[in-house]
Amino acid sequence: MKLTIATALASILLIGSANVANCCDCGCPTTTTTCAPRTTQPPCTTTTTTTTTTCAPPTQQSTTQPPCTTSKPTTPKQTTTQLPCTTPTTTKATTTKPTTTKATTTKATTTKPTTTKQTTTQLPCTTPTTTKQTTTQLPCTTPTTTKPTTTKPTTTKPTTTKPTTTKPTTTKPTTTKPTTTKPTTTKPTTTKPTTTKPTTTKPTTTKPTTTKPTTTKPTTTKPTTTKPTTTKPTTTKPTTTKPTTTKPTTTKPTTPKPCGCKSCGPGGEPCNGCAKRDALCQDLNGVLRNLERKIRQCVCGEPQWLL
């Protein structure tokens, strides 16, 4: 681990000097190196250093930037799409430890082109790399860690672009801020002092009362005149008595009803088709009791237990 950290720091320092050879004409990206987990080798844990590669601008003497022709295109093996601007990473031939020959996995990073001074034409990067059975088209990617090349012939290994594992988006819990209720500042009511004006008491001027002498007039007694009482004669009106007219009473002749029965009353015989008197009385009494019960319950509204 210490060796890999030391090589990473040394590569960062060498990137600043070898920015022209590292395909800066495609645009100087600012990428952060994060190692993806591998299947066979243990994952890289870059907890101490987070390196950001910054490309230095090219010198003012260069008028045109050369296109990215760093490696010759090899024969593609079962490739369907042509990847734009993916510069192959040159891995250093390992001499002592086999741990340094790890294939660098390039993640898709969007790079913004930087505008440089005195540049007339900028040619696009046309260096396709060979990928084995890949159908995804990746944008222009820059290598994360570049090691200084030695005098030995460099063996260019094809970069195996692994599918980018999308990390699950961790939704942060929404922290609801407590609503701070501002205390209502009650302004003190300023009671103005009531200015009582001094009542100016005017001096009462007491006028001297002039007492007039009372003159006593002599009382003159008038003689009382008695009027004679006149008695009116009472006139008696003659009472007129009206003659009483007696109306003659007309007596209607009584016609006997055609019944066929004898006269009503006790001891009479019933007519033909009528029931006996005893049974008729019982039926009529029962009908009267039912009518009384219906009147008391339905009309008067008495409950059933009072009936």
Swiss-Prot record:
Residues spanning the signal sequence: 1-23
A Gene Ontology term for the protein's cellular component: extracellular region
Disulfide bonds: none
Tissue: Specifically expressed in the salivary gland.
Main location class: secreted
Residue span of region Disordered: 56-257
Stated name of the protein: Salivary glue protein Sgs-3
Designated gene of the protein: Sgs3
One GO BP annotation of this record: puparial adhesion
Entry annotated with the keyword rRNA-binding: no
Superkingdom of the source species: Eukaryota
Post-translational modifications reported in the UniProt record: O-glycosylated by Pgnat9 in salivary glands.
Keyword terms: Glycoprotein, Repeat, Secreted, Signal
GO molecular function, one term: bioadhesive activity
Subcellular localization: Secreted
Organism: Drosophila melanogaster (Fruit fly)
